[in-house]
């Protein structure tokens, strides 16, 4: 006979098992830093070997088409499988704000240029940020992350 306690335990297992396996994607590698003062180890993220090319999500080079949605789709797809590399290929890419998520390595290939739009409304809705040390809602920064971990911006 199944008790309510057994049913609840099974339900928790079903809910939390995918979350635990999702978090396994990124590993941390400690790096010792020589400093003239006591300092804890720095940890580098070792991201899974998965690439998400923004062109597969509709991005077009040339600096004329706004690629904000395509880049966001690539970031979301990468995040949903536990992380990896979102690749910005060689070329000029017009975009609005880029909102990173956990376990994302935003990778710029050699010759890749991000051109951020100069249209203020592209940086809305407002996000929590800081201005002169005060937390406030404001236009989104060019590259933004909030409540994230294991993120990097790398490239050649």
Where are these regions (language model features)?
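Extracellular "leader-to-stem" segments immediately downstream of a signal peptide or signal-anchor
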Residues: 2-9, 21-87, 92-156
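Hydrophobic h-region of N-terminal signal peptides that target proteins for export
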Residues: 13-21
């Amino acid at each position: 006979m199944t008790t309510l306690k057994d049913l609840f335990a099974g339900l928790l297992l079903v809910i939390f098992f995918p979350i635990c396996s999702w978090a396994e994607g990124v590993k941390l590698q400690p790096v010792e830093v020589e400093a003239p003062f006591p300092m804890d180890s720095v940890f580098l993220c070792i991201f899974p070997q998965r690439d998400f090319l923004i062109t597969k999500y509709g991005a077009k080079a040339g600096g004329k088409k706004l690629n904000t949605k395509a880049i966001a789709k690539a970031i979301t797809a990468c995040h949903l499988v536990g992380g990896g590399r979102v690749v910005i290929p060689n070329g000029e890419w017009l975009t609005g704000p880029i909102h990173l998520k956990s376990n994302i390595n935003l990778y710029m290939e050699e010759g890749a240029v991000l051109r951020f739009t100069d249209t203020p409304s592209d940086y809305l809705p407002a996000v929590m940020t800081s201005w002169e040390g005060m937390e406030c809602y404001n236009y989104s920064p060019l590259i933004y992350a909030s409540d994230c971990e294991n993120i990097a911006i790398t490239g050649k």
